[in-house]
Every structure is written in C-alpha cells, then in structure tokens.
Amino acid sequence: SIYHVWKILMIKRLVNFTVVYFLLLSISFGTQKYCKSCKGELTGQYLIHKGNNYHRSCYDKHIQIYCDHCNRKIEASYNTSKGKNYHKRCFQQHIQKRCDECGDLINGIYNVHEGKEYHESCYVNHILPKCDICYQPVEDKYIKDFWGNYYHHYHEDKIPSCDNCNRLISKQLTKGGFSVSANRFVCNLCKPNVVKTKSQLNKNLAEVLNVFKKIGINELPERIPVTLVDSKDDLIKMSGHRHGNIQGYTSYEESTLAGKIIDQDYHIYILSNLHEEIFNAVLAHELLHVYLFQNQIDLKSDFREGFCNLGSSLIYENYSSKLSKYRLKNMNENTDPDYGIGFRKMKSMLDKIGWKRLLKKLPRL
C-alpha cells in the first residue's frame, strides 16, 4: 500500500509581540494638565504613557497591564499569546510551547502529530517512521507491506521482490536471497521451505490429494506427472497463456475411438522454488483443472478459473499461516475477471451450498 507520510499535520509559528512600556514620572510646572482617563486636573506627580497624562490611580485602574498568569503588574517588556499578556518569565515557564520529545521551548515552526507538538528536527529524527531498508526518515511516499515493513516508495523500483512473500529482497528485510531465473527471485526467509527437486513432488501430491478426499473429490490420478519449471516466461510460452502471474499449467490430451474417450493424459507444470504452501495451492488449482477434464465439464473462463482457485483457497485455509493469509488476501483483492472476480463468485456459491452440492451443480453452470 502506498501512503503519504503524516509529515507535517500542522505548522504554526509562535509570534511573541514584545511591547516596552516606559513609565515616566513627571512634575508639572506652569501649564495646566488634565488626566486623559478621568479628565480631572493633574497636580503634583503624574504618569505619561504614549503621550497622554494620567493620575497614578487612573493609570493603575485603566491602563496598567497585568499578567494573565500571575495577575501581577507588568512594568517592562512582555509577551502576548492568544489575546493574553504575560511577564516574559511567566510566559516561558508556563505558557510557551515545549517539545513533547526533548522538553525544550519551541520558538519557531513546529510539527503537530497525534495531538503532540515537536521541534521540526525532533519530529524528523524521532517521530517519523524510519525506512527499514536505508534507515533514513520517511518524509514522502512510503510503502507499508503486509509484514509490517516501512520503506521509501522508490526502493521498489530498484530492489527485486520475493516470488513467494513479495518482500523486497535485501539484507535488512530478508537476509538476502537468490535468483531462480532472469525475472524470478526468492528471499532467504522463504528459501528453507521451497519445492525445487523431483524427490519432493510425490509427498506434495499426496498431501493435496488427501485434502481433496476430505471434501469428496476422490477420483483424481494419484501418479499424475508434475514437472518443475524455473522460468515464468517458459511457462507462459508452454501454456499459451498471457496472464503474467501464471504459476502453473496443466496439459491435457485425450484419445478417442468411435467418438468415445478411451484414454486421457495429463501433465502438470509448476514454477520451481515456490514456498511449499504456495506450491501445494498451485498444485490444487491444477488438479481441479484435471477434475474438470475428467468429468468433461466445460465452464466459462470465470467459473472455470474461479472454481480451480477454490482448491488454492482450501489449501491456504488448511495452513492458516501468515504466508497463507497473505496469499488469501491477494486472492480476495484480485481484480482479474477470472482469477479474482470469478473466484469470489465461486467462493460465495461454495459458502452457501458447500462442496457436495457445488460439485453436483458444476455441469449446469
């Protein structure tokens, strides 16, 4: 998923208006003077403020500024904030914003995140998420993957992803990885569980057939040939399929005599170095193609691929691991008309009527 970092949710500038009041003590000689406030005659000592004359009592009552924190007179420069006045010391100690990270006063631009306020530098260095690949703060577009890793969006253009878990293959995220072919890579987290040799295939085939027997699919061939293919391009050419995400393919040949099928041959091809859970899910998908061939059930492409994807879904649900949950999430979010939308149509039908009735209903779809 691509996000824009909550870089600066709010930027504010503290503006301290400092006004210096000079209280001038003056004695009148000669010219008669009057108080600006009460209009009474001034005799003896009086105060001059901004060119106007005041009795001391009138000045204290009407002109004198008081601190809105301690309620004492302000006799020198002061700070204002949100229409209130403060001694400089009162403002710094009780009113002025402090960084919620370092605790120091905030005097300029600051960042607000989740109701807390930070110096710009504190926000960047301590609050912003750090890229799990380059460890730098993420201040622009970033990816948060299924596994909880954060990284800059641009790393996706430079670093290959694992063919199984889709993590970016790097020392930091996957402890490295290896290439299977020109366009296929596997990370070292998935490596211990991949299917890459013929000796593994019989075990995997038996496991999947056993899962199918539990839902009433009992007549699938138990010795069907399965071949591993390294290159996805080779698999695409072999199948004549244009779907770029292809992971398996089943070839089917039949022999007929007098219009009747007397023999059927199947051969399944699956990408090598798939994680065992994914390999079994792909194998289940291909075996359901065999089921359709066996029973001469010809479905529209969305029902056909959607039905076969029910096999993959069944395998992932049996594992219930985080990897299988990730693959199920992708299946449920896939927008492809056949493999995504078609799958969800068939899954909805399966959830309503169950496997037994669905298998009976297939020929009529």
Feature names for model-found ranges:
Residues 30-210, 214:
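N-terminal low-structure segments adjacent to metalloprotease catalytic domains
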Residues 212, 281-295, 305-309, 313:
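Active-site recognition of the HExxH zinc-binding catalytic motif
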Residues 197-266:
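Auxiliary, metal-adjacent structural segments of Zn-dependent hydrolase domains
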Residues 16, 127, 201-204, 279-280, ...:
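Hydrophobic (often cysteine-bearing) scaffold residues that line and stabilize catalytic clefts
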Residues 3-30:
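Classical Sec-dependent N-terminal signal peptides that target proteins to the secretory pathway
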Residues 128, 132, 156-174, 178, ...:
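Pan-zinc metallopeptidase signature
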Residues 262-283, 295-300:
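Short pre-active-site segment immediately N-terminal to the catalytic Zn-binding motif
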